[in-house]
Amino acid sequence: MLSAEDFSDQVLRLLPLLRRWRRCEHALWDPRARRLQLSVATARNSARFDVRVDLHPLYAVPQLLLRYWEPDPAVSEYEVWKLHFVDPYQLPLWQPGRFSIALDQVPATSGSAYETWYVVNSCDTDANVGPETDNYMLRWFSLYGQLLDENLGFTLAAALVAPCTDQKKA
């Protein structure tokens, strides 16, 4: 479990790494809502995911939400993207069977409305990531981020080793 302060602090430390991630087209931290928002391209750059990471209000663990966009072939004059809702296990994700994913209505980014998102179940997060709060978000994104990029876990795991290597040189 993470406190809201730990969640915010760790996401802010993770943000520069996510912005260097080759598939991340946009990364934004909303301090008021304590929400991480990303736009991520698929492997073949043929579709996009809106990614939202919130702190689950009940479990106090990160919650991954996804929306899937594809280009609209009916419009050829300019690029238009359409929001698609398909079976969660038909999404172009890497090993989606590792996690329970379902469509759900969640509070909108702003206002009192609700939006439909794919939600990755948060129940087993501590069992998957471990309960230690140090580097929790880095470990979490190394695991759950693999849905979007199978190599992301290796990239972020290297960041865990780098501080140890730097300290040994001093």
UniProtKB/Swiss-Prot annotation:
CC annotations in GO: phagophore assembly site membrane
- Its main subcellular localisation, reduced to a broad class, is membrane
Q: What InterPro entries does the annotation carry?
A: Atg10, Atg3/Atg10
Q: Does the keyword Ribosomal protein apply?
A: no
Q: Name one GO biological process term.
A: autophagy
Q: Which cell locations does it reside in?
A: Preautophagosomal structure membrane
Please list the residues that make up the active site.
C123 (glycyl thioester intermediate)
Q: List the Pfam families hit by this protein, alphabetically.
A: Autophagy_act_C (PF03987)
The superkingdom listed in its UniProt entry is Eukaryota
Keyword line: Autophagy, Membrane, Protein transport, Transferase, Transport, Ubl conjugation pathway
Write the Enzyme Commission number(s) for this entry: 2.3.2.-
- Which Gene3D superfamilies does UniProt cross-reference here? 3.30.1460.50
Coiled-coil segments on the chain, per record:
none
The UniProt GO MF terms for this protein read: Atg12 transferase activity
Q: How does it sit in the membrane?
A: Peripheral membrane protein
Question: Quick check: keyword Disulfide bond in the entry?
Answer: no
So what family is this one in? Belongs to the ATG10 family.
Q: What is said about its interaction partners and assembly?
A: Forms homooligomers.
Q: What does this protein do?
A: E2-like enzyme required for the cytoplasm to vacuole transport (Cvt), autophagy and nucleophagy. Acts as an E2-like enzyme that catalyzes the conjugation of ATG12 to ATG5. ATG12 conjugation to ATG5 is required for proper localization of ATG8 to the preautophagosomal structure (PAS). Likely serves as an ATG5-recognition molecule.
Q: What is this protein called?
A: Ubiquitin-like-conjugating enzyme ATG10
Q: Print the organism lineage.
A: Eukaryota, Fungi, Dikarya, Ascomycota, Saccharomycotina
Gene this chain is encoded by: ATG10
